[in-house]
């Protein structure tokens, strides 16, 4: 089964916890703190594997969670960093953040990698908190939580040429004639429901990859007839070969077909109109085809170059292939998304915190709920089993301005304050 879009969950590994320990050696009184730091959590890394051709494997495994870092140890020993979790994807995979729609990675070449979910840093051991006024601190941090997100994987086939047109115009037959590909061919609409790829050799030491894309219908740009799934694969092609049935046996007008398909390409993505398009008048071996071709030429005008062919008899196919090969040589590759200006925005793949530090809401029972990336991260990295860590967390909340914000919202002694699933009493 060909699968070209899936939604999966990824989570980087949490950092290892820091250690509270002290140096205990003979003849070394008051040895001081010796707790090591936790190791960094593993990243979730996508890597291109050229042997893959579909996202089928992701239908059976949709959750990818990397290992956490090793905890810190005594004698100042730091925890080990965990090995990154490598997730193999086929060439042509685009990774998008499900929540924001931001493109996180465009993976096209074998061995190319991208970090999709970063692991958290290790928590600091108590040796990191030693000061002149507190030489033996009872403080250590928990590991930083790893980044987690839902992502959409979209596979866009890597082909130089894309065959487009209405169903049953002869796209699959043409591909089978010019390459070794063997797409399914039958006398009914939508015989092709997945892209088929074939390597075409022109006979003069030139070759290119051609994709037979499923037939389009009116409204495809809006998703009609699985239009989004089909049009997605045209975005990477450099040349569009527009196949039109000149026989008229389907009861459609060739010129109306031409206008409809071009409108669908334009409505789906304006960049598709920038690609050179070769118009192919197919089924010229059929009755009335020549008459229909002349009427078609009168409507489109002389500026549109038309290649009359018969995919069945191979009439005109050779000239068509030479024209396509020439266009590929002179047409650059088109990016599938706008290039991000890194001077004004964040670098792609960078794990960024939210701009707002915290938000305070009040529930119907009077409980104050504090949320936000910074405060939730600080909370998760605090070891509440140790008094000094609790006091440090209270100082951090004051430093963030949370105490003052709670008072401004009307919080009084004894009111309940909630962070994540934990509740505290507010003490003014």
UniProtKB/Swiss-Prot annotation:
Keyword field: Cytoplasm, GTP-binding, Hydrolase, Magnesium, Metal-binding, Nucleotide-binding
Classification via InterPro entries: G_OBG (IPR031167), GTP-bd (IPR006073), GTP-bd_Obg/CgtA (IPR014100), GTP-bd_prot_GTP1/OBG_C_sf (IPR036346), GTP1-OBG_CS (IPR006074), GTP1_OBG_dom (IPR006169), GTP1_OBG_dom_sf (IPR036726), OBG_GTPase (IPR045086)
Domain Obg: 1-158
Chief subcellular location: cytoplasm
Keyword rRNA-binding carried by entry: no
Molecular function per GO: GTP binding; GTPase activity; magnesium ion binding
GO cellular component: cytoplasm
Record Pfam families: DUF1967, GTP1_OBG, MMR_HSR1
Entry cofactors: Mg(2+)
OBG-type G domain location: 159-329
Disulfide-bond pairs as recorded: none
Subcellular location: Cytoplasm
Residues annotated for GTP binding in this entry: 165-172, 190-194, 212-215, 282-285, 310-312
Domain (OCT): residue spans on this chain: 350-428
GO biological process: ribosome biogenesis
Role noted for this protein: An essential GTPase which binds GTP, GDP and possibly (p)ppGpp with moderate affinity, with high nucleotide exchange rates and a fairly low GTP hydrolysis rate. Plays a role in control of the cell cycle, stress response, ribosome biogenesis and in those bacteria that undergo differentiation, in morphogenesis control.
PANTHER family from the UniProt entry: DEVELOPMENTALLY REGULATED GTP-BINDING PROTEIN-RELATED, MITOCHONDRIAL RIBOSOME-ASSOCIATED GTPASE 2
Assembly description: Monomer.
Family the entry assigns: Belongs to the TRAFAC class OBG-HflX-like GTPase superfamily. OBG GTPase family.
Name of protein: GTPase Obg
Name of the gene: obg
């Amino acid at each position: 089964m060909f699968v070209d879009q899936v939604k999966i969950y990824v989570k980087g590994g949490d950092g290892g916890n820091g250690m509270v320990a002290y140096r205990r050696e003979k003849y070394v009184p008051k040895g001081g703190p010796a707790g090591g730091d936790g190791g960094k959590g593993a990243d979730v890394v996508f890597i291109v594997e050229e042997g893959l051709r579909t996202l089928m494997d992701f239908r059976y495994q949709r959750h990818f969670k990397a290992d956490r870092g090793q905890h810190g140890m005594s004698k100042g020993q730091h925890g080990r960093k965990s090995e990154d979790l490598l997730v193999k994807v086929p060439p042509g995979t685009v990774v998008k953040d499900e929540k924001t729609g931001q493109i996180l990675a465009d993976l096209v070449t074998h061995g190319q990698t991208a970090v999709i979910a970063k692991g958290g840093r290790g928590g600091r051991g108590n040796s990191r908190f030693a000061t002149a006024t507190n030489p033996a601190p009872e403080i250590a941090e928990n590991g930083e939580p790893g980044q987690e997100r839902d992502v959409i994987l979209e596979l866009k086939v890597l082909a130089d040429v894309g065959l487009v047109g209405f169903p049953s115009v002869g796209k699959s037959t043409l591909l089978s004639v010019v390459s070794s590909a063997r797409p399914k061919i039958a006398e009914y609409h939508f015989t092709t429901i997945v892209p088929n790829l074939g390597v075409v050799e022109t006979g003069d030491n030139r070759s290119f990859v051609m994709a037979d894309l499923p037939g389009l219908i009116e409204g495809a740009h809006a998703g009609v007839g699985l239009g989004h799934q089909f049009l997605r694969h045209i975005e990477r092609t450099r040349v569009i070969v527009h196949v039109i049935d000149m026989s008229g046996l389907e009861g459609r007008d060739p010129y109306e077909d031409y206008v409809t398909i071009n409108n669908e390409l334009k409505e789906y993505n304006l960049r598709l109109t920038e690609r050179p398009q070769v118009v192919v008048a197919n089924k010229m071996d059929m009755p009335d085809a020549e008459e229909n071709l002349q009427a078609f030429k009168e409507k489109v005008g002389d500026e549109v170059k038309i290649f009359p062919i018969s995919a069945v008899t191979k009439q005109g196919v050779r000239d068509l292939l030479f024209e396509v090969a020439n266009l590929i040589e002179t047409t650059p590759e088109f990016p599938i998304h706008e290039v991000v200006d890194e001077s004004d925005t964040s670098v792609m793949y960078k794990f960024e915190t939210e701009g707002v530090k915290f938000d305070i809401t009040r529930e119907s029972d009077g409980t104050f709920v504090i949320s936000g990336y910074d405060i939730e991260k600080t909370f998760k990295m605090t070891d509440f089993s140790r008094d000094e860590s609790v006091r440090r967390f209270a100082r951090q909340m004051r430093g963030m301005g949370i105490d003052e914000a709670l008072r401004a919202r009307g919080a009084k002694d004894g009111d309940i304050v909630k962070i994540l699933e934990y509740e505290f009493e507010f003490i003014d």
